[in-house]
Structures are given as C-alpha cells and as structure tokens.
Amino acid sequence: MTATFEPNCDPGTLASIQANLGIVNAKIAQAAKDGARDASRISLIAVSKVQPRPRIEAALAAGHRVFGENRVQEAEERWPVYREHFQDLQLHLIGPLQTNKARAAVEMFDTIHTLDRPRLAASLARLFDELGAQRTCYIQVNTGEEAQKAGVLPDNADAFIAACRREYGLPITGLMCIPPADQLPGPHFAFLAEIAKRNGLEKLSMGMSADYEDAIKLGATAVRVGSAIFG
C-alpha cells in the first residue's frame, strides 16, 4: 500500500472486518490441519460483489489482497483505483462470463473461474495471444446438473478440459463448482476433486461462507467467502 491511500471507513467497520478475517483464517487453518493439509496453500478469496466501498477498503486496510467479483462491469467501476495503490492485489472473476465481456475480463482480472464453453475458450485463447497476457483459468463444472446454472456438465468435463488444453492452448489450472443450494455440498466437492485428479489438475475452487471448512477437508485450494467476512 502506498502512503497516499487512506481507507474511507469508520473504525467500527475496520475492526469488524479485521476480526472477521481473523476468524475465517483461523478456521481455514484448523480445517487444513484436520485434513492433513498445508494451510499456506489455500487461498482465501474475499467475495466483494455488491459490497460498498468502505467495507472493501476496510478489508484492504486489514491487509487482505485477494478479492472475487461476479460481474466484469462492477469490477471495472471500482477496482482500477485500488490497483494504483496495491501492486499485490489479485482479482478473481467468479461469476458467469459472457463472451462479449471476455476482453474486459482479461484486462481486469488475474484469474477466471468460470470457463465453461468452447466459444469462450476460443475467445480467451485469442485474447491471451493478442494482448500477450496469460491469466489463470479454472473450468466451472455444473456438478448438480442444474439447468439454470452455468458450467460444463460432468459427463462433458473430461473432453472439455482436453480441448481447452490441446485445441485452445489455455493454461487450465483447476476446476470450480457451486453445489446446489438444496443439497449437501460434500459429495459435490468430492466429485469435483475426482474429476480434477483424473485430469491432472491440482487446483480446486470450491466452498463459500457456509461450507468452506468442509471444502478444505475435501481438497479446496481456493475458497470464496463473502458474508463471513463482510457481514
């Protein structure tokens, strides 16, 4: 952080978010220990979508640097100014990506978690080449096969992973899922881990405020936590 950045948040907001981050990080450490895993290899993505600027600035002032947004336009409206002050800031796109927003996403985000179709893969490959910029990519798998939810279907996941690697030359790092709200998340986390393992993928983006501890025990390397941090 540069000396010129002054967070626009009241002391109570700062104290609350500092405390929440401490609690979440402690739970991550305990879940990692319970799962015989290294907590330092698990990334906490603070989901800042729809959060007001004072709460985001409180998280920044508390030392957090990894954030997730659902919409490209929302990120474009507020993150450039923070990029100027925080060189180690990492932005993750965790919401569905329209192909016509791909260029803006590549320019704004460090990691894209929601690659799920050939047309988007082709667009990202072209943009990476054109802009000379590589971004970390996760493939979203619709583990619950929900019609209203984005993500490649499980039966198509292996073929899509292979196509992204061989046909499009994309740097596929791992897989992402959002389990159905009305089902236990554990089986979906385990299912995603199984798909990743057989495809030689080490990263798993899974787990949110209500279930990130379970996700860590089942192999999550990135958890997406919003309300447990921001309230």
Each model region followed by its residue ranges:
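Conserved alpha/beta-domain cores
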Residues: 2-203, 208-210, 216-218
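Gly/Pro- and small hydrophobic-enriched strand-loop and loop-to-helix capping segments
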Residues: 113, 220-231
